[in-house]
Amino acid sequence: MIMGNIQNRIDYLRKELIRHNGLYYESNNPEISDSEYDNLAKELEQIEKENPLFALPDSPTKKISGFVSSSFEQIKHSSPMLSLDNTYSQKETAKWYERIEKNLNNKNTEFTIEPKIDGVSASLTYINGSLTAGATRGDGETGEDITENIKKVKNIPYKLKADNPPYFFELRGEVYIDKSDFRKLNEEILMSVGQKFANSRNAASGSLRQKNPQITAERKLRFFVHSLGKIDGKQFESQSDFLQYCRKCGFQLQDNFKICHSLKEIMDFMEIMINNRDLLHYEIDGLVIKVNSLQLQKELGYTNKSPRWAIAFKFPAKQATTKLSRIRVQVGRTGIITPSAILESVTLAGVTISHATLHNFEEIERLNVNEGDTVLIERAGDVIPKIVKVVKKENRGFFKPPHNCPSCNSGIVKENEEEVAYRCINPECPAQFRRHLIHFVSRNAMDIDGFGKAVIDQFLDRKKIQVLADIYYLKYDDFIKLDLFKEKKTSNLMKAVAASKKHPLSKLLFALGIRRIGEKVSEIIAKKFKSMEALFNASIEDFTRVPEIGSILALSLKEFFENKTVRNVIDNLIAAGVNMIEPEAEQSGTQFDGKMFVLTGELKNHTREQAGKIIRSLGGKVASSVSKKTDYIVAGVNAGSKLKKAKELNVKIVDEAEFDILTGKLSLIENTKF
């Protein structure tokens, strides 16, 4: 790169980093993800390293990110609140570990590892055991005085509970908001001002900087302590000793904290947290690894912006910016017209993303998004990515809902003003029928293994399936002609089709796709009414007598079974030999008869759905909340408030291994807890 180009690139990177730093810390309105920001910073750092003549003392690479708002008084920290060096790969983490071991002459160093909370850094100061000051990190040297707001954070003690508290004690931690509280807050904000926070970090930051402390109190903020600032009259040998002292003082610590003695232990813990991060009740964006010994920390020292004895391993980005290429409109199996976003491909959390959900047309209007706009997308867990906001507006027009179904060109309607969704009401709409077929053969419905979308599309193209019952009249010659089908594959699929005829009524009801009726309600009404004919003869009053069915579900059921087209569908299925009866539940004679169960936390060997089916097959019942009527609570990993309530009510608590033994489903898979 020639000199002029080097200078231009450096100028651009510095301006961009300063701009994005302001958007992140001052406006709480970032345009790019953390990883994208770090990539810009690393590029600038590398150029400055290779071209030292261009390096300046005030470069963003040499300063702690952050700012001090003029809206608050300022507080000087007793010692700098530094940022941490970041790494985005386990390979880089291993290199850092090896560097530490080498610098310490391989002293069999202990390390601590804990989740990195995606919140807002804060410093707390206690004088003689009483909370006297709270401050943001600010620029690392000076922070904003948020003392009155910090006092409103739910789990921060006003007075330290430990005996003989030190005269001066400054500690640091992260202010955050629980996922469930964040969802509730966003619903309230949306209702009152028509906007919502993009993520929980923004919510915590905005709530902590309120001029009215009462608003902060209502936001249900929480605090995790993670590091020592300064303490008089007391010494700690290690980071873990310091944290245990904080626990005695009344602070809440993270449960997912581990002391490691080798790189393998660190990597194993990283894998567990990467795979289980979405089970936590708060957001984390990585893991923090520290040398445990405070004496060794002192030996390793600091750079101008971060400690050498700690590193932050950042998870793959859950947010990224990209361009919205096209808004595609598609038809669901119940006729709902749904928009979805076609994106320029971008890597997010290790996955290439090219689609995102837009939910409905009101969401498009709320986001003010259109084709060509640059958008921020987010992926939480394994759910479909969503568009969080428009970053750069390129298209000034408004995207309008279509007037006609994109599949059959029939008119589309809103059935009532309360509904958000538009529907195609043509019962012969090809797109609806295709979606209906996909649902009908799916695992939780008729469970015809191997009858996937590609098979369905070929049969539709060849006009071999025109009504549901046609599935059961397909011949060997029809299957063997499908792409990539040979003898064994054909035989297996024909067996799966034949086996599906014998499924209980409950699976058929779910497969039929009755509006508002899910799998659980399908099971309930099948057990109650026993046969398809009884359902056709039932009145609305008959349906509402079932405790789990209210007036809206009863109306959906009645409308469905009154429909002449439905009657024809069922008659055709009966003629094809499909079972229309719910078998009597076997009398198990176990202690589950009539017992009420609640499932909580993450189960390793079962899905919630599978565990519920096991319980019901043995005569038990499954409830969604704990009460005095609960007999058992099955507690998986990260069980929350339900487990706490169960303990208060003296409900029998079993873990997954005990549940497997009770049900005779003992698994050979070890139930890993962390």
From Swiss-Prot:
The superkingdom listed in its UniProt entry is Bacteria
Co-factor requirement = Mg(2+); Mn(2+)
Q: Quote the cellular component terms of the Gene Ontology held in the record.
A: cytosol
Residues involved in NAD(+) binding: 34-38, 83-84, 114, 137, 174, 290, 314
For the keyword Zinc, the answer is yes
Alphabetical list of PROSITE patterns matching this protein: BRCT (PS50172), DNA_LIGASE_N1 (PS01055)
What molecular function terms (GO) are annotated for this protein? Answer: DNA ligase (NAD+) activity; metal ion binding
Q: What protein name applies here?
A: DNA ligase
Q: What is the lineage of its organism?
A: Bacteria, Pseudomonadati, Elusimicrobiota, Endomicrobiia, Endomicrobiales
This protein's encoding gene: ligA
